[in-house]
């Protein structure tokens, strides 16, 4: 499981994204930092997450799984491993 954060200058808001792959997913399709970056590049291109000339993207691999209550998530979507076929707002949670 990964936690990804970035500042979206279009919304003036820091987005927090939790990414979790199904347990039965083959090893070659498991999430990686690169696949998550591909997803974020679709949802929020570099030009909209750059502040003071620096990319605000941070991707952290979590050591444990976190159970997320779908009722508190703003939206839950899926994408393929390359970040394709994703809605423009992806799955994000606000705290």
Curated annotation (Swiss-Prot):
This is Uncharacterized 10.8 kDa protein in Gp30-rIII intergenic region. It comes from Enterobacteria phage T4 (Bacteriophage T4). The gene is y12K.
């Amino acid at each position: 499981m990964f936690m990804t954060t970035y500042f979206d200058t279009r919304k003036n808001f820091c987005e927090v994204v939790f990414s979790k792959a199904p347990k039965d997913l083959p090893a070659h399709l498991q999430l990686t930092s690169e696949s998550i970056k591909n997803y974020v590049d679709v949802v929020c291109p570099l030009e909209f997450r750059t502040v003071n000339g620096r990319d605000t993207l941070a991707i952290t691999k979590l050591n444990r799984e976190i159970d997320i209550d779908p009722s508190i998530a703003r939206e839950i979507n899926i994408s393929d491993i390359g970040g394709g076929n994703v809605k423009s707002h992806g799955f994000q949670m606000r705290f």
